[in-house]
Design a protein with these regions (language model features):
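Exported/periplasmic ABC-transporter solute-binding proteins
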Residues: 25-328
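Sec-dependent bacterial lipoprotein signal peptides
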Residues: 2-23
Length: 328
């Protein structure tokens, strides 16, 4: 196993640094997967907020639609992938595309798949126990498979001098055992630990991947610490020099980038990076998943798309999005 990248007293990592290779090749050449797929035959898809770029990039590449990364003017907090015809006329309708390709968030995407409102999803996590129960209750079996590597990272305000926490310190902050930054080498000030809403992919990963059964702080009586959107931790940390939050690595490095300046902390002295995610030296590595109903016809475009993303061509597209494809 490769030696982990270490961080000892160096400045924190802004999300911008890991995004440079993505922004440097903003537009793709027109290319398809070899399929003869018309847009009107394209399946209904859904996704998490953080997996939207990979879902969209695969769709554009298969359909032969050129694309570019650009700031999402609606949110103002992320970059997204959009069609790029560079002023030329095209029959492709972005409005029609958005109607067939939803972005309902992790829990919403699984709900739509269970309720047959969509045909295939790419989500930031595996199906949860509650979602699995909902599927079982209506006699639906969901097939899920990890498609790419991600991680849960911890972010702080750039003015916060803390640059590294141990896994144990993170857990103690979120159980309420550690309450002051001076206990972890910072200034003498109370820590504000921000959390996410219950059904979010980030919260589920925090509880299972990081806390591993430990009881987290309860936001019931502190609603101000609960973030309801993917951008919430960033907006909270931007305004709070003494806060800490968590977010997917890809969302931070590929989507937020420089729009909101935060520092990613190293954990156990390992910097979150593509290298440390690939070699699994960063402690909180996770996966994103593709999911489909078991009853989906093998002749359907949805089923063929599900199979395609696990091929070499599919993996190349996932890598192009900035994610790290899981390759057999």
């Amino acid at each position: 196993m490769q030696t982990a990248m270490k961080l000892y007293g160096l400045f924190g990592i802004a999300c911008l640094s890991a995004a440079l290779t993505i922004s440097s090749c903003a537009k793709s050449e027109r290319r398809t997967s070899g399929w003869d797929v018309k847009f009107e035959d394209w399946p209904l898809t859904d996704c998490s907020t953080s997996t939207r770029p990979v879902r969209d990039l695969v769709a554009y590449k298969v359909l032969g639609v050129p694309y570019k990364w650009e700031e999402d003017w609606l949110s103002g907090t992320t970059y997204i992938i959009k069609p790029d015809f560079n002023g030329t006329k095209s029959s492709f309708s972005y409005k029609d595309y958005l109607e067939k390709n939803l972005c309902s968030g992790t829990h919403g995407a699984y709900e739509n798949l269970i309720e047959s409102k969509t045909d295939m999803i790419i989500a930031s996590r595996d199906i949860s126990r509650n979602e699995l129960k909902s599927a079982n209750d209506v006699g639906i079996k969901i097939i899920t498979k990890p498609v790419a590597i991600d991680a849960l990272v911890f972010i702080v305000n750039p003015k916060n001098p803390v640059r590294n926490l141990s896994s144990d310190q993170v857990r103690k902050i979120y159980t309420g055992e550690i309450t002051n930054w001076k206990e972890v080498g910072g200034v003498d000030h109370t820590i504000t630990p921000y959390i996410r809403d219950t059904d979010s992919g980030s919260q589920e990963k925090m509880e299972t991947l990081v806390m591993a059964g430990l009881t987290m702080i309860d936001g019931t009586y502190m609603p101000e610490i609960i973030g309801s959107q993917m951008a919430s931790p960033y907006l909270q940390i931007e305004m709070d020099e003494y806060g800490i939050g968590y977010t997917p690595f890809f969302y931070c490095t590929a989507m937020v980038r420089d729009l909101i300046k935060v520092n990613m902390l190293s954990i156990d002295s390992v910097v979150p990076s593509k290298e440390s995610l690939k070699n699994n030296t960063y402690p909180f590595v996770s996966s994103i998943y593709a999911a489909i109903r078991e009853t989906e016809s093998q002749e359907s475009i949805a089923h063929k798309l599900f199979q395609f993303i696990f091929t070499k061509s599919g993996a190349d597209m996932i890598d192009e999005s900035g994610y790290i494809a899981i390759k057999d």
